[in-house]
């Protein structure tokens, strides 16, 4: 099916929002211009809504295989499509871990059969993510590994991390890291700060993250490897990443929507839906994340979509697993709380969620360019809705944002020229 999207707006090559039509033919973007006509295409009236590149998320947890009670490839990718994401990169903390040919082939088969959006799987750095034996990077790359990570845990052994970085560099691949120094975690469930002190909880200190990043940056410099830092959350982390970039070290970084919108002061009670890793930090950390995003220290926004069951989250803040869902709330949360408040521009938000992650990892995504695959999301910037977890397509309803009123909701998502999700009665 060919589609002609009429009377929309998009961000052009100069980074400006302008009026446009967009023609999709044979799964590709055929033309982006005003006043397009086409005889062989279904016309979809966009009514002034934003036509954006499909959003790109380099940090997601789909849970399958092994955690299908939390999420499946089918439910997770439907939720991604509803959130406007067309390319997502799935973390390897599944059971089994994609750490060998057999496991990666099985994962790719599942993705091919079930995914509603483009899914690029990470390969594990170590076997079973246990930190003691390196995986076969060459085989995992051959089978389509997006990059290498042991996300969910930090690689504690510096010699293992250095060897992994050297091997990845030879393959022109990135090493992506969840950064925690295990000896400093302190059995914490929240940030070590005012909230932990008030409620008598063990806290995770900020330096637990930043010291690990500092170590890895020096290892990346020695290995000449592209090193990407997951979910940056502290002022100290921003500082060491900024210094590394100024020194010419190949380091990039991401931040989550929840760390951009919330800090520990916003946690209303010992609610496990506010428990994530890294935890919500202090006000100064939150300000540093915004500053780092604006000055280029932090390159992109990624959701760290981490679904869990209601039963798991009901165990209380100390026992409940870390993580919140992110796909279906990311864009409206960021648009309402950053763009509408004048902290960043709409153009910047689009870039942080599309071209910046795509360019960082060399993906042919993130831009509406003629000849490229038609991965598109259409967003109604005026639509206001209350976040209601009962309407999530994700199995995970674990969000701290229930009841928040937000503007800027995706109404249609196109993947490979086909409609992957559409809000009922969204377009005429």
Curated annotation (Swiss-Prot):
Q: What is annotated as the active site?
A: 304
Per the UniProt entry, the Enzyme Commission number(s) are 3.5.2.3
Report the catalytic activity. Answer: (S)-dihydroorotate + H2O = N-carbamoyl-L-aspartate + H(+)
**BP GO terms, sorted:** 'de novo' UMP biosynthetic process; purine nucleobase catabolic process
* Positions of disulphide bridges: none
The family database entries (Pfam families) matched by this protein are listed as: Amidohydro_1
Would the keyword Metal-binding turn up in this protein's UniProt record? yes
Residues the entry annotates as binding substrate: 61-63, 93, 277, 308, 322-323
Q: Which EC class is the enzyme in?
A: hydrolase
Organism superkingdom: Bacteria
Q: Does the keyword Methyltransferase apply?
A: no
Q: How is the cofactor bound?
A: Binds 2 Zn(2+) ions per subunit.
* UniProt binding sites for Zn(2+) 2: 151, 178, 231
One Gene Ontology term of the molecular function aspect: zinc ion binding
Q: Which NCBIfam families match?
A: PRK09357.1-2, pyrC_multi
Its annotated function is as follows:
Catalyzes the reversible cyclization of carbamoyl aspartate to dihydroorotate.
What HAMAP family does the entry give? PyrC_classI_B
The entry's protein name is Dihydroorotase
Lineage runs: Bacteria, Bacillati, Bacillota, Bacilli, Bacillales
């Amino acid at each position: 099916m060919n589609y002609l999207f009429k009377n929309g707006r998009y961000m052009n090559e100069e980074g400006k929002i302008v009026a446009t039509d967009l023609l999709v033919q044979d799964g590709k973007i055929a033309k982006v211009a005003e006043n397009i006509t086409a005889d062989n295409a279904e016309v979809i009236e966009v009514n002034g809504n934003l036509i954006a590149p499909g959003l790109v998320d380099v940090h997601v947890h789909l849970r399958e295989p092994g955690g299908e009670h939390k999420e499946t490839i089918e439910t997770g990718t439907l939720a991604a499509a509803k959130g406007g994401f067309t390319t997502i990169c799935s973390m390897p903390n599944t059971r089994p871990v994609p750490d060998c040919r057999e496991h990666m082939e099985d994962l790719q088969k599942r993705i091919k059969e079930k995914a509603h959006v483009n899914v690029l799987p990470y390969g594990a750095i170590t076997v079973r993510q246990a930190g003691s034996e390196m995986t076969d990077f060459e085989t995992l790359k051959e089978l389509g590994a997006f990059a290498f990570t042991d996300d969910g845990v930090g690689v504690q052994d510096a010699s293992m991390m250095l060897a992994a970085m050297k091997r990845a560099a030879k393959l022109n691949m990135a090493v992506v890291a969840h950064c925690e120094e295990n000896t400093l975690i302190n059995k914490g469930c929240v940030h070590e700060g005012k909230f932990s002190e008030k409620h008598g909880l063990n806290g995770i200190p900020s330096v637990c993250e930043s010291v690990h990043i500092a170590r890895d940056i020096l290892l990346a410099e020695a290995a000449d490897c592209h090193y990407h830092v997951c979910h940056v959350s502290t002022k100290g982390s921003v500082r060491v990443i900024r210094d590394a970039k100024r020194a010419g070290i190949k380091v990039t970084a991401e931040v989550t929507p929840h760390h951009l919108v919330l800090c520990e002061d916003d946690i209303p009670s010992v609610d496990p839906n506010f428990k994530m890793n890294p935890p919500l930090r202090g006000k100064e950390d939150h300000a540093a994340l915004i500053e780092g995003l604006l000055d280029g220290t932090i390159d992109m926004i990624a959701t760290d979509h981490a679904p869990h069951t209601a039963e798991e989250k009901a165990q209380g803040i100390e026992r409940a697993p870390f993580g919140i869902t992110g796909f279906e709330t990311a864009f409206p949360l960021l648009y309402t709380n950053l763009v509408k408040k004048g902290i960043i521009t709409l153009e910047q938000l689009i870039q942080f969620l599309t071209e910046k992650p795509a360019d960082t990892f060399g993906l042919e995504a993130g831009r509406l360019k003629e000849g490229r695959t038609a991965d598109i999301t259409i967003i109604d910037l005026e639509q206001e809705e209350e976040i209601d977890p009962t309407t999530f397509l994700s199995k995970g309803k674990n969000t701290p944002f229930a009841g928040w009123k937000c503007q800027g909701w995706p109404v249609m998502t196109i993947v490979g020229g086909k409609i992957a999700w559409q809000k009922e009665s969204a377009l005429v």
